[in-house]
Amino acid sequence: MKRFFLLFLLLNSAMLSQDYQLVNQFGLFLDATSFALSPQGYFYVADNGSDEIYKIDSLGTEVKAFGGYGWNNGQFDYPIDVSLNALNIFVTDKNNHSIQQFDKDLNFISRLYTREGDNSDAAFGFPLSTDVSSMGDVYVLDSENKRILKFDLFGKYMLQFGGFDAGDFAIKNPLKLIVTENNNILVLDGMSLIVFDLFGNGIAKITLPEKFNSIDKYYNSITLTGDSTIYVSSQEENKLSFTKVNLAAVNGNTKFTSSLAVSNKIYALTYTTIFSFVLSEK
């Protein structure tokens, strides 16, 4: 618990907040649920309204739209989360109980589906989130069984953790997970942030000061996103420290679903668009 103590202190410190100005708005979505940014500068956006994944360049131009409703490879039924590593894109297809993997041009590679398999330990249903470690291991947030499953990059089951037998670290209201640069697994679970190591051992459980919709990462920058608030953190070794940012020129009715902190910029996803903010010079 001690290594993450600073997190709670800074979440409540308004004196440390930073000011960001709105500089751009791009994308037009029906019900965007998640987005990720590649090292090449492309955004990948999951849209539940159209059951599609959009690839958008840094200027906001749509490069490709892919998917559509269905249950075959390359089709989706509630694409709830999109994540990536250096080479591939991973789409969490909630109502199809699967994780689909694509290359950076959205060409289909593979599909992970275990719900009707013989191994109940490996089975997941209605997945909410997926992320990949630096070693290529895939972590799936299983909402049906309220646990996390770990697979290798080829889909071989490795272990499960965070279930009912995890004691204080049992997941109860899972929302999303990320794998940090130092391979800790952070799970947004209701009003708590639960931290596991790569072997599934519980490290910390932190009570959050408000309800958040998402936790996201861009390299070592981590964000917590609420309806109208965003907190930004950088992780150094085993220390997390979040600060709240002030976002100017945003309509009070705007609801954020996800966010990314990239250098001196913040990208905030809503159901219908992406806002781009830049850090104000003081």
Residue locations for each model-derived region?
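Eukaryotic scaffold repeat domains enriched in small/polar residues
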Residues: 18-282
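Sec-dependent N-terminal signal peptides
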Residues: 3-13
